Amino acid sequence: MADAPTRATTSRVDSDLDAQSPAADLVRVYLNGIGKTALLNAAGEVELAKRIEAGLYAEHLLETRKRLGENRKRDLAAVVRDGEAARRHLLEANLRLVVSLAKRYTGRGMPLLDLIQEGNLGLIRAMEKFDYTKGFKFSTYATWWIRQAITRGMADQSRTIRLPVHLVEQVNKLARIKREMHQHLGREATDEELAAESGIPIDKINDLLEHSRDPVSLDMPVGSEEEAPLGDFIEDAEAMSAENAVIAELLHTDIRSVLATLDEREHQVIRLRFGLDDGQPRTLDQIGKLFGLSRERVRQIERDVMSKLRHGERADRLRSYAS
């Protein structure tokens, strides 16, 4: 189950790399390693997520309950270890997803292995935020976080373009460590913590951080088709939360899938009626003119479709978004 996708991914990566280059060799070694873990279905993801949750709760009990017996401690420690094993399994089963997404950003000045490393940080963040009770497939949920991590890594690198060569490596190293520590600590690391982790003298930390804040164009195109500017991926205080952004993207995907089960005319009427393509809803009269139908016939089609969407498998697929 794992070998075939890995061979396909390796083949696609080979087509983008010089077959004799050291980078190609490193990528092949990496892909061969991650291909040993089988891909997961939705049920497998949920089972692992439950074990991870149980491990975290057991760890919390060990840290906060002072009067636990030795047998209870041993049992909880076993649950913690099982949760950690489940976490590794979920991570390793999705590393190929990171490679697949990272490959779309090659050719923009950042080596593929660096893109993969940034994407792996996004995968770890997705694991921390994932809530299996909402019914989303983890790999679908993680895609948003992986893409965000990669585009942020690209932005960090672009800030260093005008720096002297001898500073670029240190700035990139510090930026990566800063992100890793933020994910581990759940807050921004202090200058002292950054210095201890990076081995860079504390009096140099501030200088490097200032260099890393050099401006970058928010109009820089990113994405597999260069369809969106970098600014679309940068968080701001007024933007919707990351969680809501993920849910909105998943909802949009599920709506498209549900509408695809309708016949062609029903599909087109609903897309136009609610402005799903361009955000501009059409009136019954406008849709009627497009299809050569009366206003009342368009209304009847809309009513029939909405009735279909309220019942059966279609409704089940969309109901979780209403909670």
Curated annotation (Swiss-Prot):
Sufficient to interact with RbpA as annotated region, ranges: 1-228
Record lineage: Bacteria, Bacillati, Actinomycetota, Actinomycetes, Mycobacteriales
Region of interest called Sigma-70 factor domain-3, as start-end residue ranges on this chain: 169-245
Family matches, as PROSITE patterns: SIGMA70_1, SIGMA70_2
Consequences of knocking out this gene: More sensitive to SDS (cell envelope stress) and hypoxic treatment in vitro. No effect in human THP-1 macrophage-like cells, intravenously inoculated BALB/c mice or aerosol-infected Hartley strain guinea pigs.
CDD domains tied to this protein: Sigma70_r4 (cd06171)
Keyword DNA-binding: yes
Underlying gene: sigB
Pfam families (UniProt xref): Sigma70_r1_2, Sigma70_r2, Sigma70_r3, Sigma70_r4
Protein's UniProt name: RNA polymerase sigma factor SigB
One record GO biological process: response to heat
